Amino acid sequence: MDIRAAEISAILKDQIKNFGQEAEVSEVGQVLSVGDGIARVYGLDNVLAGEMVEFENGTRGMALNLETDNVGVVIFGADREIKEGQTVKRTRSIVDAPVGKGLLGRVVDALGNPIDGKGPIQAVERKRVDVKAPGIIPRKSVHEPMATGLKSIDALIPIGRGQRELIIGDRQTGKTAIALDTILNQKPLNVEGAPESQKLYCVYVAVGQKRSTVAQFVKVLEEQGALEYSVVVAATASDPAPMQYIAPFTGCTIGEYFRDNGMHAVIIYDDLSKQAVAYRQMSLLLRRPPGREAYPGDVFYLHSRLLERAAKLNDEQGNGSLTALPVIETQANDVSAYIPTNVISITDGQIFLETDLFFQGIRPAVNVGLSVSRVGSSAQTKAMKKVAGKIKGELAQYREMAAFAQFGSDLDAATQRLLNRGSRLTELLKQPQFSPLKMEEQVCVIWAGTNGYLDALPLNKVRAFEDGLLALLRGKESGILEAIRTSRDLSDDTAAKLKAVVESYAKTFA
């Protein structure tokens, strides 16, 4: 057999030509110790703060403490599989999450992975979870209403698109119920074919709640047809602390996609007390020095950098907005604890819910005296401004008088009238769950209350009067609601028509 030199040299030349010189470089470290969701890693000298790292078994982690001889990594998952001596490699990417309209109608975990069994998420891009909030120049003052559908909030503590309004109260006072009703109330705005400037997408972040509670919440959204314009981010009680810590940031990034693309979104963090507890756990295990109530010194910055990302952007930036409704759970109505005072000082107002009111049957259990909205009437339509100004004043007088009336039995007629009107208005502001009212319906009902049409009724008939009046306005007299809806104002002409309808209805009701 003859050896063909030319053929051999051709093969060798071909192989030399295709010889790849690029080698895959990966920086690898070793696990020194692991426990309680924290791993100490040696050898990752160039790792960035907040960078994702990957353990041997595929579990991800995030480098938080960069020390001289090791790196403190928080583990996004179970630490049982990770053992001392295993390798850890850099991913060269900061923690990111999927964003986009493909997430609507889905339930995802704290890193944006779907957990609802509906398959992979379609057509999305990825964004970093912890980015800087918009500066001062791109912002605009809040001027459009973000309707919750609850009379006591939309009339007395109005929320605007781009505002941050805290919902604060003890456990079992209806904080999540307010959030849920707000999501359900956006259904008429999110109809097919509606303009993007009208729509309001919803992001609900569940932190440290029971899985059954989150499942129930999602079920209600599905039944009411509200899941199609919502995203649920869940880091439940059984998830490790790092997942509960990162979930609000992931949710915020999902909401920011809408804000930055000229759309509107509302995000509900339920609740930030549990995120602070998870962050405290991580910080103590990373041996960071504790401060007040054993929280780390930067727990204020944790919440401020999250909530500052909710904003109303100006015309050059596309006019989008992200409204934040953080929830804080207090212990025995103590709003002077560390986390509640922090979040109160960051937000643009708060809705106080009280156990006593809840058990008196005033639901939503909003304490109107202590609750404020620092945006105020600029977040209301003209029609609502006209009727809400009056009810605010009357309720304030009523609260003052009710305190004094406990002492004196012989009250003059004017005081008696005031107390009578106040108790009727308080009754009027009650509202059952899952029955949000449109702005124009609230205006008509509150108008009837402040103009004295309820004064003669017994307290237990107020709800029936309201239901009957609304049925009449939605049916035969729908022109009045239509006029208020289109003009967003209560003109003299419409007010006269409304007066005639309410007067004739009051006669038949009596």
UniProtKB/Swiss-Prot annotation:
Annotated binding of ATP, by residue: G169, D170, R171, Q172, T173, G174, K175, T176
Keyword ATP-binding: yes
Chief location of this protein within or outside the cell: membrane
Provenance organism: Rhodopseudomonas palustris (strain ATCC BAA-98 / CGA009)
InterPro entries according to UniProt: ATP_synth_asu-like_sf (IPR023366), ATP_synth_asu_C (IPR000793), ATP_synth_asu_C_sf (IPR038376), ATP_synth_F1_a_nt-bd_dom (IPR033732), ATP_synth_F1_asu (IPR005294), ATPase_a/bsu_AS (IPR020003), ATPase_F1/V1/A1_a/bsu_N (IPR004100), ATPase_F1/V1/A1_a/bsu_N_sf (IPR036121)
This protein's GO CC annotations: plasma membrane; proton-transporting ATP synthase complex
Listed name of the protein: ATP synthase subunit alpha
Keyword terms: ATP synthesis, ATP-binding, Cell inner membrane, Cell membrane, CF(1), Hydrogen ion transport, Ion transport, Membrane, Nucleotide-binding, Translocase, Transport
Reactions performed catalytically: ATP + H2O + 4 H(+)(in) = ADP + phosphate + 5 H(+)(out)
Gene: atpA
Lineage: Bacteria, Pseudomonadati, Pseudomonadota, Alphaproteobacteria, Hyphomicrobiales
Reported function: Produces ATP from ADP in the presence of a proton gradient across the membrane. The alpha chain is a regulatory subunit.
Alphabetized PANTHER family for the sequence: ATP SYNTHASE SUBUNIT ALPHA, MITOCHONDRIAL
Subcellular location: Cell inner membrane
GO MF term list: ADP binding; ATP binding; proton-transporting ATP synthase activity, rotational mechanism
Gene3D superfamilies: 2.40.30.20, ATP synthase alpha/beta chain, C-terminal domain (1.20.150.20), P-loop containing nucleotide triphosphate hydrolases (3.40.50.300)
